[in-house]
Amino acid sequence: MTNTLQFKEFSSFVNISFWHELSNKKLDELKLSEESIPLNGHYTFSPSQQLDPFLCLEFNAFLRNNVTNSTENQYVLPPRSYLSHGTLYNYNTVDDFKQSPKIKLFNDASKRIWNDINNGNIDKDTSLLNRFILLTYADIKNHQFYYMFGIPALLPSQPIQQFTEKPESINIESLKSFSNQILPQYFCLKQQQQESSTTTTTSFELIGSIEEKGNQYLNECLENDLIPLVGFCDPCSLPLNPGWPLRNFLIYLSIKYPMLKKIKVLCYRGNGSTSNSILLSLELPSMGEQLIKKQQEEDAGEWSGKSVGWEKDSNGKIAPRFVSLASTMDPLKLAEQSVDLNLKLMRWRVMPSLELEKIKTTSCLLLGSGTLGCNVARSLMSWGVRNITFVDSSKVSYSNPVRQSLFTFADCSPKAKEKSIAAADALKKIFPAINANAHVFSIPMPGHSVPQSEYQSIRNTIELLENLIKQHDVIYLLTDSRESRWLPTMLSRAHGKLCINAALGFDSYLVIRHGIKDQCQNELNPSISSKLGYQGSDLGCYFCNDVIAPTDTLKDRTLDQMCTVTRPGLSMMASSIAVELLISTIHHPYGGRAKGETETDVYVQGSTPLGIIPHQLRGFISHYQTLPLFSNPYKHCTACSDYIIDEYNSKGFDFIINVMNDSSCLTKICGIDDLKNTEVNIDWDIDISDDDDDNNNNNNKEKNDDF
C-alpha cells in the first residue's frame, strides 16, 4: 500500500532587526539601486510539536558567508541552525514592487538549484538545496514594509510515494548517539538492532555528512541491493509530514543516483525529553524525463521545469505581506532615524559626497541665545548637528517668543526662565536625542570696568568660557553688542577654532568667518600651499576694520537702542547663511583654513561640492542683495593680531582685566596708537615743508579727526 508524501511548507519569520538593517542599507548603500543582494537565512529542527517550521531572517542576514578576509564580518549561524541561501530584490516604489517579474525571479532561483544539482555543486555543499527569494518595498519614511517570500521546491515527474501506511515513530532511546553531536544538514546513517531475551532495541548511528560520505555509502547500498538510510534536520513537527528541506534533497538523490528506487529517511527533530522524530520509507520516481528536459533547457537557455514554494498570506492566497514597525520602535530611535532621513536622501542623487557623519559629530558653541541664537540652533539641528551648547546671561521676556523661535509664552510667565536653559530645553523637546547644554553667565567685555572684589568671579567666568571654546569645534558669535564679541574672538584665534560671526542692522546683516591662525604653515611646501590657495589664516575678523578699541556701547542707550530693532525676517536670513557657511566649510579639505572666495558666477564650480566658501557675506534687504566679500587680517587688529594673542598668552587674566577696566590699552598694545602718532607727525611735517594755504591745513585736521 502506498500513499503520496506531503510536505509542510516554511513560514517566514523576519526579525524586526532585519527591517532596521534593510532601512539603513537602503539609505546609506543601496539608495536608488534595485540590484539583487545575497541574503542568509536559517532554520532549526523542531523539538516541539507546537511550532511551525520557520525560515528566519535576522539583523546579520546581509553578512557574507565563507569570508577569507579577516577584516570583514562573517555570517554566523545561531546554535543548532542550518543555512538557507537567499536573494533580496528591493524596489524603489510600491508600483515597481507590485509589477515585479515574480514568476521569472522564482524560476531563476529554481534553475539555480537545478544547475547546482547537475554540475556537482550540491556534492560539495548541500545547503545550496535550500534557496529563497525575498521581494520587498521599504517605505522607510513611514517604517512600513511590503514583502513576498518564495522558497522554491522542484517538482518531480511523479509524486513521491511512501511504501508504508504511515511514518514510523522513533523512540528517544534510539537517538542517544546524537545527543552530543552537531549534526550536518543532510547525513547518512546506519540502523542497528540489539536483541535480548525479552526485547529488541533499535539505535541509529551517524556515518557522516552527505558531502563527505554520501557518495560512497549510497553506491555501496546500490551494489549490495540495500535500502539506504539517510537523514536530515527537520524543521517540521507534524507526526505524518516532513519539512520543506526534504523536497529538493529527494530530487537531488533521484538525479544523482537514477537506479535508487527506495530509500528510508530519518526526519530528525532534536533529542529532548521526548522524541517527535519520524522515519519515512519512500519510493523515488525516475528522473530520466527531467534529465532529457535539462538538455532541452541548455539548448533553449530557459528553465522549463516546475517548482512550487510561494509563501501564502493568512487567507491562503499568494499575496504580498505587510508589516509596520512604527508602533513597535522606540520613539527616540524612531525620531533619530526620521531626522536623518531627508539628509541621507540628499546623497542618493543630488550630492553623494555629503559628509553627514562629519556634520553630525561637529560640536557648536552658541554665544547668545536670542534671535540669532535660536534660529542658528534650529538650522544646525536641521543639518543633523547633535552637539549644541548655549551661553547667555539674560532671561526670556514677553517680547521674545514672537521673534526668538525656541521660546514660548510659558518661558516668560509666570516666572521668566534663563534664555540659554530655555533654549536647550526647547531643543530636547523638539528632538530628545540631541546633546543640548546651557550655561548662564555674562561674557566679560572691554570698557566694562569691574571692582576688585569681583575679580575672582570674572576669573572663573573667563576660565569657563575658555574651556567651552576649547571643547567645541565651532564658535558662533550671536550676542547683541559689539564688545561682547571681543573676548570670544580673541580666544578662538588663540586656540585655533573656527569662529563664525553674525550681526544685524536694521535692514542689513553681516556673516563673517574669522581666519584661523595656521600653526602648521611652516611645515607645508610653499609651492603646494600657493597652488591650492591655502589662505585660511589670511582672513580678517569682525574687528579687523577698526582703528579704535571696542568700548562700552550699552551705557546711556535709549529704549530703541537697547532692543533689537531690525526687520524681522533678517535674523532668519543671517542665521541660515551662518549655518550654511559652516556646512560648506566642513566639506573643504582644509576646513576652517580654506581661503575666502568671492566668485558670484553660478556657473563656476566652487571649491566644495556645496559651492564656494566666502569669507564674509553682507546682505542688504532694502535691495534684496547679498555680496560675498573678502578682507585681509589687519596686522594691528585689536582682537586677532599677534600683538594681542601674545599679550594674552603672556599675561592671561591680568591682560583681560586691564582691557575691561580700560579698553584703550588695546590700541597701545596692538600698535594703533603708534600708527596714529606716526600719521600725525607725517601730516605735521608736510604742513611745515609745504607753504600751503589755510584750506589745506583744515583738510588735514579733518583727516586726523577720522581716527
UniProtKB/Swiss-Prot annotation:
GO terms for biological process: autophagosome assembly; cellular response to nitrogen starvation; defense response to bacterium; macroautophagy; mitophagy; piecemeal microautophagy of the nucleus; protein modification by small protein conjugation; protein transport. It holds the Pfam family ThiF. It is found in: Cytoplasm; Preautophagosomal structure. GO terms for cellular component: cytoplasm; cytosol; phagophore assembly site. The active site is at residue 563. CDD domains: Apg7. SUPFAM superfamilies: Activating enzymes of the ubiquitin-like proteins. Its main location: cytoplasm. A motif (GXGXXG motif) lies at residues 368-373. GO terms for molecular function: Atg12 activating enzyme activity; Atg8 activating enzyme activity; ubiquitin-like protein transferase activity. Disulfide bonds: none annotated. InterPro entries: Atg7, Atg7_N, Atg7_N_1, Atg7_N_2, ThiF/MoeB/HesA, ThiF_NAD_FAD-bd, Ubiquitin-activating_enz. Residues 686-707 are annotated as: Disordered. Disruption phenotype: Impaired survival when exposed to pathogenic bacteria S.typhimurium associated with the accumulation of S.typhimuriumin in large vacuoles which fail to undergo autophagy. Keywords: Autophagy, Cytoplasm, Protein transport, Transport, Ubl conjugation pathway. Residues 686-695 have a biased composition (Acidic residues). PANTHER family: UBIQUITIN-ACTIVATING ENZYME E1, UBIQUITIN-LIKE MODIFIER-ACTIVATING ENZYME ATG7. Homodimer. Interacts with atg8 through a thioester bond between Cys-563 and the C-terminal 'Gly-120' of atg8 and with ATG12 through a thioester bond between Cys-563 and the C-terminal 'Gly-124' of atg12. E1-like activating enzyme involved in the 2 ubiquitin-like systems required for autophagy. Activates atg12 for its conjugation with atg5 and atg8 for its conjugation with phosphatidylethanolamine. Both systems are needed for the atg8 association to autophagosomes membranes. Required for normal survival when exposed to pathogenic bacteria S.typhimurium by promoting autophagic degradation of intracellular S.typhimurium. Belongs to the ATG7 family. The GxGxxG motif is important for the function, possibly through binding with ATP. This is Ubiquitin-like modifier-activating enzyme atg7. The gene is atg7.
